[in-house]
A protein has these predicted regions:
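Anionic N-terminal interaction surfaces
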Residues: 1-36, 46, 97
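Acidic, Ser/Thr- and proline-rich intrinsically disordered linker/docking segments
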Residues: 2-3, 56-126
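Short, surface-exposed coil-to-beta transition loops
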Residues: 25-27, 44, 80-84
């Protein structure tokens, strides 16, 4: 029917940082397959992050994100609040890195909660 969105399993997130070649504050699509998260951008192509490389997933307001990751606890939101989803992972070269996405609703949180459900983030070797 008119006005209904097609449910193709993809969510739109605003990319903030971490994906090489993806523009900051521009939308990208994210979807899950059996073993990874796939990020696509109409301009830059595709990036794939295997679940096995994910170390943690955090969800926080913009003020906390800017303070923790940029040592500058400020906000740019004009109306409402931006929420950041941060995926900490180990790169294929062994470096600790992160991806950051934002949204003004619970889209990011719901998507990354599903990622948590599919990964074994609960078992950590110290």
């Amino acid at each position: 029917m008119f006005g209904k969105k097609k449910n193709d399993g993809k969510v739109t997130l605003m990319h903030y940082e971490g994906l090489q070649g993806f523009r900051q504050d521009f939308p990208c699509k994210a979807e899950l397959d059996a073993s990874s998260i796939i990020f696509t951008n109409e301009v830059s192509g595709t990036a794939k992050l295997p679940f096995t490389q994910i170390q943690s997933i955090d969800y926080m307001p913009e003020l906390n994100f800017m303070g923790k990751y940029h040592n500058n606890p400020t906000t740019t939101a004009k109306a409402g609040m931006k929420w950041f989803s941060v995926v900490n992972y180990t790169s294929s070269s062994g470096e600790a890195k992160y991806l950051a996405f934002w949204s003004v609703d619970s889209t990011g949180r719901k998507f990354f909660d599903e990622v948590r459900n599919r990964t074994a983030l609960g078992s950590v070797t110290l």
